[in-house]
């Protein structure tokens, strides 16, 4: 079904997202401020559902840091009740994040650290992970209200890479 590789230093599975895209549709990732309000839940659901119905998205990537990522993952889990073919993938910045009970019980179809982050300094890992996600994705759903910070930087990078960005 999916081609799976074992990431040498982490001992966890990694999806080859290009194959997923070809075989199962398009990819959408989420970028947003960690202090995002819970009131975004309905807007996130609407935006993600439009990605499924109008753009053919079947795989959603989330980062797992902060409230926005929590809301995004929760949204995809809700969407899976209606669209069981969609996938939720956690792209972690650190291997230690994969051992968290939240990840193990979080309803993710896969969770991994991109192998390109193996030698990245700890403080740069989230920025590098966000760039990796922006490179892999077709679409971005974002919550950015400040022209600063990691979410803003990730969205700007995705735009430079020609990705379609949906701001909520």
Positions of predicted regions on the chain:
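Short, Lys/Arg-enriched N-terminal segments with co-localized hydrophobic residues
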Residues: 4-22
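Acidic/glycine-enriched connector segments
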Residues: 22-168
């Amino acid at each position: 079904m999916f081609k799976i590789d074992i990431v040498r230093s982490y001992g966890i599975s990694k999806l080859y997202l290009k194959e997923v895209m070809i075989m199962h549709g398009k990819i959408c990732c989420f970028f947003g401020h960690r202090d995002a309000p819970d009131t975004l839940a309905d807007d996130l659901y609407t935006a993600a559902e439009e990605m499924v119905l109008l753009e053919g998205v079947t795989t959603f990537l989330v980062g797992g840091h902060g409230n926005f990522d929590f809301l995004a993952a929760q949204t995809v889990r809700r969407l899976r009740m209606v669209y069981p073919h969609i996938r939720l993938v956690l792209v972690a910045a650190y291997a230690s994040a994969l051992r968290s009970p939240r990840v193990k019980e979080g309803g993710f179809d896969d969770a991994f650290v991109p192998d390109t982050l193996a030698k990245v300094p700890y403080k740069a890992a989230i920025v590098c992970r966000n760039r990796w996600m922006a490179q892999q994705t077709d679409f971005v759903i974002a919550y950015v209200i400040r022209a600063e910070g990691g979410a803003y930087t990730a969205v700007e990078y995705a735009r430079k890479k020609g990705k379609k960005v949906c701001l909520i």
